[in-house]
Amino acid sequence: MNLFFEKTGATNVAEFSVSEIAGALKRVVEEKFGYVRVRGEISGYRGAHASGHAYFALKDDKARLEAVIWRGIMEKLKFPPEEGMEVIAVGKLTTYPGSSKYQIVIEALEPTGVGALMTLLENRKKKFAEEGLFDEEKKKPLPYMPKIIGVVTSPTGAVIRDIIHRISDRFPLHILVWPVRVQGETSGREVAAAVKGFNVLPLEGLIPKPDLLIVARGGGSLEDLWGFNDEVVVRAVYESSLPVISAVGHETDWTLIDYVADWRAPTPTAAAEKAVPVKIDLEVYVVSLGARLRTGLARYFDFHQQKLRAIIRALPTADQLFALPRRGFDEISSRLERALCVSCDKKRLYFHTLAIRFTPRLLNTEKAQHSAKEYTARLHRAFVHIVEKQRAQLEIAFRLLKSTSYQNILERGFVLALGQNNKPIKRLAQIPEKEQINLRFFDGEISVITQESFFNRSSKSKRIKSKQDDQGTLF
C-alpha cells in the first residue's frame, strides 16, 4: 500500500473525512451557482408531505435533478405542482450530505407557459366529462326562496361584501361564510373541505345547514384561479347534496368548477341575484294574486247567484202545486156525498116497499117473523159494509188532501206571506213598502213591517206569541 502511494505521488495529498468532503462540495456548489433557473418536467410528485414540504424531481430526456419546496413557499405558490407538468423553477443549488445528492431548493415555480396550463386544463376537462361529472341531467335545481345561504370565499375583500350587500338589498336572510384561501397551493383543498363541511352540518344543529352554496372569487389570471381547477374541488361539488352556484372570476373566466356546479354565475354579484328573489317583486305578485282571487270569487258567486235565481223562477208556485190535488179532492168529495145520498134514498124506498107488502097476518106468524129478522140482519150487515167502504174511501181522500195541503209545506220550513185581506204574496214586487204583512208558519203567525227598499230590505218583526214558544230556526 505504501509502495502504491509512493509510486503515485499521493503521499503529499491532503486527507479529508467524508463529512469534510461533503461540506466542501456543498459550499462550492452554493457559492458557484447561487440562484439558478431550471426548466424541466415534474416527476415523482405525490403531493405535499405531512410536514407541508414537497419532494419531487425535475427531469429532461438526459438527466434528473432532485427538488424540494419548503412549506412556506408551497403556501405562496399560485398553482399546485402537477405530475408531468413542465415548469421553470427558480432556487438555489445545494447538496444533501446524508445521501451525497445535490438538489435545488425551489423558491419560485411557474409553468413554462399558459399553453401548458391550458393543455393540462383541457385534459382534466375531458376526463371529468367522460366520467359524467358535467352532465346537465345530474344538476340539482336551485331553491326559489332559501332560508340560509352558505358562502365559500375569502373573508376579506370585495367579493364577500358584494354578496352580502346584494342579498340584503334583494331579500335579507341568514348567510354563513366559510373562510378559505382562494389562491395558492392549499386553496383547492380548503374549498373542497368547505363544501364537504357545509354538507355534513346537521339540520337542527347549533350551526344550521344551508339550503344553497355559493363558491366565489374575484377575477385573476389562469394561475390565480388554478385552485378551482383542482380535482378535489370538482369532485366535492359533484358529490354535494346541496345545490352549488359557482362565481369564480369574471364573465370571461372559466374554471372546472363552473362546469360541475349546478349554476354558473358570471360574477359574485350575479350569484347573489340568482340565489334570492326580489322581496318587493314578491309582495307585488302576492297582491296581484289576491286581487285575482277576489275577482274570481266575485264572478263565481255572481254566476251561481244568477243560476239560483233562474232555478227559483222555474219552480212552480204554491197555487200551482195545490191546484190539481185540490180539484181532485173536491171532485171525490162531491161524488162521495152524492153516492151516499143516492144509496140512502134507494134503501129507504126499498124498506118502504117492504113495509107495504108485509101484512099483520104474515108478521104474526113465526115463519114471517123469522124471515123478517133474518132479512133485517142481512140488511144491517150490508148497510154497515157499504158505510165502512165509503168511510175508507173518504179517509183515503182525506189523506190525499192532507198530503197536498199547504200546511204540510209549512211544516217543512216554508213560510206563507199574506198581504192585505190575507191574500198570498207571490213576488217581491207585491210587498208594499212600510206596510204590515203577515208571515204564516206551521205553528203560528207573526206580523212584520217592511221598511227598506226592494234591494236592501230588513224587517223589524213584532212577534206574536204562538202556542209553542220553543220553535227552532228554519235554517
From Swiss-Prot:
GO biological process: DNA catabolic process
EC code: 3.1.11.6
One cellular component (GO) term of this entry: exodeoxyribonuclease VII complex
Molecular-function GO terms, alphabetical: exodeoxyribonuclease VII activity; nucleic acid binding
Keyword Cytoplasm: yes
Main location: cytoplasm
Keywords from the named record: Cytoplasm, Exonuclease, Hydrolase, Nuclease
Compartment(s) where it occurs, according to its Swiss-Prot or TrEMBL record: Cytoplasm
Record field: catalytic activity: Exonucleolytic cleavage in either 5'- to 3'- or 3'- to 5'-direction to yield nucleoside 5'-phosphates
Similarity section: Belongs to the XseA family.
Assembly and oligomerization: Heterooligomer composed of large and small subunits.
PANTHER family: EXODEOXYRIBONUCLEASE 7 LARGE SUBUNIT
Database matches in HAMAP family: Exonuc_7_L
Function: Bidirectionally degrades single-stranded DNA into large acid-insoluble oligonucleotides, which are then degraded further into small acid-soluble oligonucleotides.
Name assigned to this protein: Exodeoxyribonuclease 7 large subunit
